[in-house]
Amino acid sequence: VYKLITSSERLKTLTETVRRATENGDEKVYRMLKQQTLPYVTPCGVFSYSKSDSLPGPSGLIVVDIDHLDSRREAEKLKRQLFDDLLLRPVLAFTSPSGHGVKAFIPYDLARIPDTKQNTSENIHWAMNYVQAIYDFHSSHPDREDKKTNHSGKGVDRTGKDLVRACFLSYDEEALIRREI
């Protein structure tokens, strides 16, 4: 995955096309392009079909997806902060397809709870709650009247709590990888 997102010219072209839709403010076109053109993975494991009870082999990884940041610069800064976080220790962190978000693949202990599905789900919830609590996702946009309230959708994407949730890949030549866990 790291090699694909850091060096694929095809993915670079697809990502640029998807990001242009975002920059033009066309959410409908952005979503369509993302879903129809970008490759994706299911970080939680390999599934026999798209249903959470079809998890024959968990990967030991979960994904935390942070969306709707105010700028690409903010996304780059958060990518580094998440990667350097001593509790999360992501094995991979990269900028999302929109350019205004971050995806982090976070390892967890496969043996903590015997029930694989429950163990994975609890780790997903822990990671999402931790990231939301530790990192400030209040909008810093100057036009926002109440900067303490998050009305922008900015922050952890909670729809990613489903084990079979697809994680769309995007080109990021500055993606961060941890080769030793």
Give the role of each language-model region.
Residues 1-100, 108-125, 151-154:
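Signature for HUH/AEP ssDNA processing cores
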Residues 6, 10, 110-112, 135-181:
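Catalytic "initiation/cleavage/transfer" segments centered on a nucleophilic residue
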Residues 61-63, 105, 166-168:
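Conserved hydrophobic/aromatic beta-strand scaffold that supports enzyme active sites
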Residues 128, 132-136:
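Contiguous ligand/interfacial binding patches
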